[in-house]
């Protein structure tokens, strides 16, 4: 039976794995200026991808851009996923 178990996917805490993967901070080197116009579309695209795997409230996803230094901005993505018991 070990051979069959090899091909069977392992069950893991998928909400926790997704939460870890989606708590992303991306440092982006760029010139100073106003927030990029792509942020709303980025949030919408992220919601579409997350919705394929778990039901999530759009208000629970935030995307922000913070100017840290003159030439360093931080793009922060926070997604609060529902507990596994909620679905």
From Swiss-Prot:
It comes from Aliivibrio fischeri (strain ATCC 700601 / ES114) (Vibrio fischeri). InterPro entries: MinE, MinE_sf. GO terms for biological process: cell division; regulation of division septum assembly. The keyword Cell cycle applies. Transmembrane segments: none annotated. This is Cell division topological specificity factor. Belongs to the MinE family. HAMAP family: MinE.
